[in-house]
Amino acid sequence: MPGAHVVFAEPRHSYPGFAEGVGEEEMESRKPGQPYVLGHDPLELARLDRQAAIIERPTRMLLQAAGMAAGWRVLDVGTGLGHVARIAGEIVGPTGAVIGIDPSVQALAVARERAEAAGVRHVSFEEGDVSTWSTRQPFDAIVGRLLLFHLGDPVAAVRQSTRNLRNGGQFIAVDFDLGGARSEPRVGLAADVLGWIEQAFTVAGASPRIGARLGMILREAGLEQVATFGVQAYLSPQDRTSAALIAGVARTLAPVIVERGIATAEQLGIDTLEDRLAAEFQRADAVMLPPTVVGAWGAVTGR
């Protein structure tokens, strides 16, 4: 799919540290099982913007494949900077409505400012957490992108969210599967760093391969008519996107990587990592396959 450069997570928006959710705590202060392992200083927010731009097309494809259409009422949980809320708003149009919720006041301020600047009135944002937020007016769809990746009990989170769906409404999960990330042919430095990133996410309480399990999670949460598929990008040796994304996530996760003994600061060499990765990809004439962007959706029935 030309131009569909799919890369790591946002928890809470694009490859983030592969996630989108915007929490204000720094990653090193997080404990296993807490919902978001990536910090959100200005550099991290900028990285999330870059990541979101890269996975915008796959996200739009997956939302439309799930049936989202004009006039729908949509809830975006863990909205972060509002990237998914904006995409959903474009799909549902002015006859629909989108509400994005997130616990981060910092992220929501940015999301609101952007929506206002764009003159978008049918997309709004509220402070709230997926485990407690509720409304009396049910939604046609609830979207969680790069959300379940960071949650200790994703099944419970889906169950909690679906109480806000109408009968027949869809829960749509979009997340990464880091298990397939690799280069062809193999580039040793990239393989090492991707391995360190996956280990760091795991010890920090995230689930870096959760994309492969999304369908199972939705079924366990009681959803019916579950469907799932993934979108895979192939980045050319000359495309620095691969190096920039890998190095950006590694920089965010560096405290965990070093403090947990996954790799030393010298092995990581974070200040030169992007340039070294880019050079290795070109030297090996290697195509990079970033983590697969997986979508799964299912309906609430019997209400």
Question: What spans do the regions from the language model cover?
Answer:
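C-terminal helical/coil "lid" or tail adjacent to the Rossmann-like core of SAM-dependent
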Residues: 37, 41-44, 226-288
